[in-house]
Amino acid sequence: GIKEADATECILAIKAGEADAITLDGGEIYTAGQHPYDLQPIISEKYGSGSSCYYAVAVVKKDTGFSFKQLRGKKSCHTGIGKTAGWNIPIGTLLTTGQLVWSGQEDLPVESVSTFFSKSCVPGAGGLVGGKLCTLCPSDCSKSATNPYFGYAGAFKCLKDDAGDVAFINHLTVPASEKANYELLCLDGTRAPIDSYKTCNLARVPAHAVVSRVDPELAERIFTALTTVTGFSFFSSAGFGAANLMFKDTTQSLVRLPDGSNSFLYLGAKYMASIQSLKKESDQPITPAIKWCAVGHAEKKKCDSWSSFSVSDGVKSVACQISLTVEGCFQRIMRQEADAMSVDGGQVYTAGKCQLIPAMVEQYNQSLCSSAGTPQATYFAVAVVKKGSGVTWDNLRGKRSCHTGLGRTAGWNIPMGLVHSIHGSCDFGGFFPSGCAPGSEPSSTFCRQCAGSGSGVEDGSKCSASSVEKYYGYAGAFRCLVDGAGDVAFIKHTIVADNSDGQGPAWATALKSSDYQLICPGGVGRAEISDFASCNLAAVPSHAVVTRQDIRDDVVKMLLDQQRKFGIDGSDPLFRIYESKDGNNLLFKDSTKCLKEIPSLTTADAFLGTGYVNAIMSLRQCPETASELEKTCISSSCSTAE
């Protein structure tokens, strides 16, 4: 073991290879994950009832008579500067509730805090604002055990000794024997007993985690070392004259995190937004452009032209970010490098697991655009075959399949959910021996029939989940059937009509829709393409725009404004958001008539509806059906609401 004075020195030692790991609090995990350290969380603490989260709370003595909304001028006890429950959450909350205000560009959060509370003990803040945040600390203001008011137990002691009026700690800090004398301050201005922390807290935050360099083998060795030590009580600090040494004393076990985990996925979108709000210099009134996330170059090209048309009074409403996949975009939105994008329902499900929310929904029926009320939006997932091929739902086993993409609604979740429920098997590769489902592992049988960019060179485009793969998306999956690369295409009900009988891009105009048929699930039924209402796999939720909670209102406002200008009958004829010149369904589905706002605070699951969510959950019983990102978001402690 290597002993350093504080966390930052340990982080540097790990980066340099002089040490391998350290347990950190969320706020420190944020720092460790930033450039130039680039460390990753590898193991998370788990507390009681299998939860790897805890609650940040504001604790006060009973009968002291003030509420969370009356904290100005009080004396405050904190676990340490930059720590989650002790600093980032309470100060971030005071900021977002408007009690604490930045006064100007040069002014830092610590300045505002030092004038907001009359006195404080914030361990580690000795060098800031002339030590004003240390006036309550008894001797030294260090972020270590020599300061009696450091850490959870210390901040509670500061309150107990009557040095402070309020302590910012976690829900497990107050000893059982003392609970009766203390209360929690709730955000709504009321008080509650200490055990009501689930309903009266400032935030639910990720567990402390062990952080190391990015090196899966090292991570495995560390996990083994920590989980095989016997005869030594890791999680108790009793006998060492202090609390929470190495691990929090309330830790019951350790959990290995997926290799793809990193600090922002682990901390989650909400906590990241909290930290970012502490980092910004002042509340600037200028609303910067909303950063749209484009997948691949064709989308980026359309986005760039949207961006240039979105300029009014010299200010852009839309800026563009690019990623190679939808999930890459989700990560950028979570990191605040991008703000929004429109995605398929199956991807809305994943976004929800990563704390993103649906803000607007694509509507495909003009009459719904003018009507008030909750947006109604569904389309039909269908299975298309060539007429005369003899393919029916009953003899699908052994055929070659064309999918819009792995994890997408019409292309994967609905058909594979049906295959799973009818045949009870998770062996999709055994059912369809080869196919094209862009986004699958390159070695998978579901990449065999994909075509890539068609350039004939190994450019990594084959099976990629973006428009560089010729068979990606709705039109791509239909084209895979047309070209004879597959026997059945799982797509949306309008796609054949959109790409035949003179409609669609060059490859499609000469096709006849009458050469294709729908097959109906669970039998030998077949139907004409136009009979989708009676012969479909499911009616499913529309594509939706996903974003972060903290920027939702700005995204909705921008889109409503852009739609007035560039929608179907927008005021500016120079650009149309719902048309794709160099491809299909770029940024939005081409069949979109308008976007409608989804009521605020609607979760991804509520938007998708129980029927569809249950279909996905059933599919998730099969291994390999959840993407790496989704698995990481779910295992990253606090992304799932209790």
From Swiss-Prot:
Entry-linked Gene3D superfamilies: Periplasmic binding protein-like II (3.40.190.10)
Organism domain of life: Eukaryota
Disulfide bonds, paired cysteine numbers: C77-C158, C121-C137, C186-C200, C293-C329, C303-C320, C354-C633, C369-C594, C402-C480, C426-C622, C436-C450, C447-C463, C520-C535
A GO cellular component entry from the record: early endosome
Entry's localization field: Secreted
UniProt GO BP: antibacterial humoral response; iron ion transport
InterPro entries per record: Transferrin (IPR016357), Transferrin-like_dom (IPR001156), Transferrin_Fe_BS (IPR018195)
One of the record's GO molecular function terms: metal ion binding
Tissue occurrence: Brain and liver; to a lesser extent in kidney and heart.
Amino acids binding Fe(3+) 2: D344, Y379, Y474, H543
Principal place of residence: secreted
Residues holding Fe(3+) 1: D25, Y54, Y152, H208
SUPFAM superfamilies listed in its UniProt record: Periplasmic binding protein-like II
Domain Transferrin-like, residue spans: 1-280, 290-621
Amino acids binding hydrogencarbonate 2: T404, R408, A410, G411
Keywords: Disulfide bond, Glycoprotein, Ion transport, Iron, Iron transport, Metal-binding, Repeat, Secreted, Transport
Ribosomal protein recorded as keyword: no
Glycosylation sites: N365
Function: Transferrins are iron binding transport proteins which can bind two Fe(3+) ions in association with the binding of an anion, usually bicarbonate.
Family (UniProt): Belongs to the transferrin family.
Subunit: Monomer.
PANTHER family: SEROTRANSFERRIN, TRANSFERRIN
Protein name, entry field: Serotransferrin
UniProt organism field: Gadus morhua
